[in-house]
C-alpha cells in the first residue's frame, strides 16, 4: 500500500491518465510488471485495476449490469464473471444491492461498487485516484480499511492517490508529488526524519511550501 500524496493539481490524475493510456506521451516509457505500455499495451494493462476520481458507473443500469459489462470488456465468460461479481460484492457488503439501480445508491456505496468492479479481472496492481473525495468520514474509513485489507488478503499492490494526510498511517510508503515532480518518497518515519519535522503533515507542508 503506497500513498501518492499531493495537493489538487499536483499531477496525480495526470500520472494515472498516462499509466492507463488516457493520455499518450511522445517521450519516456512506462512499464508495468516489465511490459511496455507503448509497445504491448494489452499485456501491460491487463494486470491493473483502476478507480478514477470521476465516477464512471452507468446510473441507469443495475449494479450487476455495470459489473457484467465491465467483465465482458475483459473477455470473461459469463459464468466466471457472475461468480467473481458475487464474491466481490459480498466482500464489500453490498451483495444485496446486486440488482439495484446504481442511481439509488449513496456516494459511498457507488465507490465501493467501483472498487469491486476494478477487481473482477484479478489485477496485481490497483490504482485509486482520490477514491474518498466528497464522502463522509464513515464511508472514507470503510473504503480505506477495505482496500488496505485487500493488500493483505489478495497480496495486491495499491497506489492510493490523495490530498488527505489523515489517510496515511505510520509505516506506510508515501510518494509526495507537486507540480508534476516527485519531491520525496519512502516510509513515513524516513520522510519525517529527513525533513527534520515532527510528523508527515509538517514534512508535506514544508516540501510543498504551504
Which residue ranges define each predicted feature?
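Conserved ABC ATPase "signature" region
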Residues: 68, 72, 79-97
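ABC ATPase "signature
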Residues: 185-186
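Catalytic Walker B motif of ABC-type/P-loop ATPase nucleotide-binding domains
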Residues: 126-129
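Conserved ABC ATPase signature
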Residues: 101-105
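Conserved catalytic motifs of ABC-family nucleotide-binding domains
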Residues: 122
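Conserved ABC transporter NBD signature motif
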Residues: 28-39, 44
Amino acid at each position: 500500500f503506497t500513498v501518492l500524496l499531493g495537493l489538487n493539481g499536483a499531477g496525480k490524475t495526470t500520472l494515472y491518465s498516462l499509466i492507463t493510456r488516457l493520455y499518450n506521451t511522445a517521450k519516456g516509457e512506462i512499464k508495468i510488471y516489465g511490459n511496455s505500455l507503448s509497445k504491448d499495451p494489452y499485456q501491460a494493462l491487463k494486470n491493473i485495476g483502476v478507480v478514477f476520481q470521476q465516477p464512471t458507473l452507468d446510473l441507469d443500469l443495475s449494479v450487476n449490469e455495470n459489473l457484467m459489462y465491465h467483465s465482458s470488456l475483459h473477455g470473461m465468460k459469463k459464468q466466471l464473471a457472475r461468480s467473481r461479481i458475487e464474491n466481490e460484492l459480498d466482500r464489500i457488503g453490498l451483495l444485496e444491492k446486486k440488482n439495484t439501480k446504481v442511481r439509488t445508491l449513496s456516494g459511498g456505496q457507488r465507490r465501493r461498487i467501483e472498487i469491486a468492479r476494478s477487481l473482477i479481472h484479478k489485477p496485481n496492481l490497483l490504482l485509486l485516484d482520490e477514491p474518498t473525495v466528497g464522502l463522509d468520514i464513515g464511508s472514507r474509513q470503510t473504503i480505506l480499511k477495505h482496500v488496505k485489507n485487500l493488500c493483505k488478503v489478495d497480496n495486491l499492490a495499491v497506489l492510493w492517490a490523495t490530498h488527505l494526510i489523515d489517510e496515511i498511517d505510520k509505516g506506510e510508503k508515501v510518494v509526495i508529488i507537486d507540480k508534476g515532480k516527485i519531491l520525496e518518497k519512502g516510509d513515513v518515519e524516513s520522510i519525517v526524519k529527513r525533513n527534520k519535522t515532527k510528523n508527515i503533515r509538517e514534512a508535506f507542508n514544508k516540501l510543498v511550501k504551504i
